[in-house]
Amino acid sequence: MSKRNDITDGIFATTKKYGLVYTEELGWIDLGHAQGQDARILKRKLEQEHFSTYYDEFHDWYFPVDYHQEMGIREKILGVDLTFHTGVYTKVMVRSCLSPTLKARVALTLMYGTAKRFEAWQNSFIFNWYTDSGFSAEDLVSDLIGFYRVFGTGPDPLLLAKPLSYT
């Protein structure tokens, strides 16, 4: 859940690791999501193809890939700082030796499906009394920016979104 003091000047959009910036093209962007760290980890897993196994029934090689999204809530209970984590985990089998383009498609599908489940989980009755971040538009758009910053080949999508400066 973002707060007013999370708003960051657009001139720092590509250098800060957290905060919110407003862009001309896409509206609010959450810089934490737009870093693409989860996409970077997923890309590495897809490139490495660890534990590839031949499956007779499919006449091909496959390897396991997992992806997750999580949130943490920090609370002080009886004077003790506690952090509670929850999230959504997805595991799939991916055919080995796919082209980089097909691996990017697999990654986007995996990230999008997991993000939808995670945002629904955040929006469930268990959490919506505490946080209003379920199906937060800036989170989903920011996840896409993070994806294209890692898997894309052109200019930085965050710069293409035209972050605004308030100075």
Describe each region flagged by the PLM.
Residues 139, 145:
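Divalent metal-coordination and catalytic microenvironments
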